[in-house]
C-alpha cells in the first residue's frame, strides 16, 4: 500500500509521556501537512534526528528552534523556553514495547543481539558501539517483485573498554 500524502502524527497513547512541546510540534506538522523528510531538509538534519526532536529524545540547537519556529509557525520564545532543557531519553515507551513496529525492533535485538555482540567483538575487540557518537538512516528499497523492504543503518563510534 502506497503512503502518498500520509504523515506521522502524535499518537495520543504516548502523548502523556512526551514533553509539552511535542504536541506543539506535531500540531504544526499536521497543520502544514509536512513529512519528517521535508522538515529534516529544512533543519539540515537527518529524518531520524528530526523525528527524535519531536519526541523529546534529542537536543534542539538554537538553529533548530529558529527553523522549526519559522516552518511550523510556532512562537520562537515558546520553543526556546520548552526545548532548551536536557532530553529525558528512553521514557516514551513501556518496556517491553507494545507498539508492534517498535516491538519488532526490540525483537531484532532480542533475537540477534548476542550475534551482533560476538561479531562486533571479533572485529573490534572488547567494547561497545556508541549511541551518542552515532547516526542512523532509514531507507526504502523495492525488490524485483515490487515488494518494499526497509533498510535501517546504524553507525556508531567503537568505544573499547579501558583497562583500570
Swiss-Prot record:
Can you state which reaction this protein catalyses?
cyanate + hydrogencarbonate + 3 H(+) = NH4(+) + 2 CO2
Keyword rRNA-binding tagged = no
GO MF, any single term: DNA binding
Which residues are catalytic?
104, 107, 130
> What InterPro entries does the record tag this protein with?
Cyanase, Cyanate_lyase_C, Cyanate_lyase_C_sf, Lambda_DNA-bd_dom_sf
Q: Which domain of life is it from?
A: Eukaryota
Q: Which SMART domains match?
A: Cyanate_lyase (SM01116)
**Stored SUPFAM superfamilies:** Cyanase C-terminal domain, lambda repressor-like DNA-binding domains
Q: What class of enzyme is it?
A: lyase
UniProt keywords, alphabetically: Lyase
GO biological process annotation, one example: cyanate metabolic process
**Family membership:** Belongs to the cyanase family.
Q: What does this protein do?
A: Catalyzes the reaction of cyanate with bicarbonate to produce ammonia and carbon dioxide.
PANTHER family for this protein? CYANATE HYDRATASE
Indicate what this protein is called per its UniProt record.
Cyanate hydratase
Originating gene: CYN1
